[in-house]
Amino acid sequence: MRNVVIVDSVRTGLAKSFRGGFNQTRADNMTAHLVDVLLERNPGLDPAAVEDMILGCGAPEGAQGHNIARNVAVLSKLPIEVGGTTVNRYCSSGLQTVAMAATQVQSGFSDCIMAGGVESISTTQGNTNMHMYVNDTLAAEVPGIYHAMGQTAECVAKRYNVTREAQDEYALSSQQRTAAAQEAGLYDDEIVPMDTVMKLVNKETGAEKEVEVTVDKDDCNRPETTLEGLSSLKPVFDPEGGSVTAGNSSQLSDGASVTLVMSEEKALEMGLKPKLYFRGFTVVGCQPDEMGIGPVYSIPKLLKSADLKMEDIDLWELNEAFASQVVHIRDTLGLPTDKLNVNGGSISIGHPFGMTGSRQVGHVARELNRRGGKYGIVTMCVGGGMGATGLFEAYQS
């Protein structure tokens, strides 16, 4: 099989849902903007060489419906011949698209695909079609399949004895690492500024107005966070005996990411500079009511298939859906703290469901290079009870 490379990956800044810079921005518009920038950043890439757009989205309906991947391809500067397909594996949708593109290239059916993910929670949450949403048989037999993600986080905390203190301590670390990374400019290369219009609402009068803004950084993190502040927050999903709070959970946010996946041969032929090799991907199911622990099963499976050990991995990007599941996975598998989410994660910078996996791939590409590492893992839990894991290797020319 052919070598598959990640040539480049860009993303928007992550903006707070409903209150941030993208609260009036369509998902297809922000993604098409990234496609155009990706073409500009890689002048050797002939737009006509791109064969498909595979885009992940956790809620592909409403403003994100109508096969958003095809909409993005048509909105962008790609030729009309470039197709598009939308993928939904909830929080691993962005990683799933990279894996799908990679296997298509690996097999020889394609040479160049744009993958990625997007989520505009601002324009979709509360506006989804709930007609006949619940399958009564499924709900009766496996009720956890319909649990809110926060409920599953509480389940993990209680079932595996993850304390409130451990969750808050991890959340604080995420905030501190993101603040340090932003101060050092470690996210700058992956973020593409975007001019847009946001809606502001006066809290006292309710008056609304639109203002022009430029989203050029992540605005969700709170550098001033303290352990005392986190410990004072009330549980959201189980007010009486719970431990999952707004402070130790991922933040609702809007954003997009696009990743260029190519055969090594075609990339070099065009004079492009790859950043990563794609080395594998796996998905494993688990009980839906504890969906957060999915990577406990998918990580060992992928390492076994790649004939690697835990100590061979130089960088771990584990999506921070909730601190309870991150702490459990970390402690169960023995993930080293100094290699895990080294620049923070979704608790501090936000989690637009469909885009996070693609964002993580782009971040691994840059951080592996900074550290001189070889292997990086991107992994996350998935709604419905799954774990998804991707393996990447730093590119050596």
Predicted regions and their residues:
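Condensing-enzyme catalytic core mediating Claisen C-C bond formation in acyl metabolism
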Residues: 1-27, 225-293, 297, 304, ...
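N-terminal extracellular/periplasmic Venus flytrap/periplasmic-binding protein-like
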Residues: 10-13, 24, 28-33, 44, ...
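Conserved beta-ketoacyl condensing-enzyme motif
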Residues: 22-112, 117-136, 191-215, 310-332
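Conserved catalytic cysteine-centered active-site region
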Residues: 25, 57-111, 144-151, 224-251, ...
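Short, well-ordered amphipathic alpha-helical segments that serve as non-catalytic structural scaffolds
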Residues: 27-43, 68-72, 97, 149-156, ...
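Active-site pocket-lining segment
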Residues: 55, 152, 190, 196-200, ...
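Active-site-proximal alpha-helical scaffold in enzymes
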Residues: 87-118, 157-187, 258-265, 330, ...
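Glycine-/small-residue-rich "gating" segment that lines the acyl/pantetheine channel
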Residues: 121-158, 220-245, 397
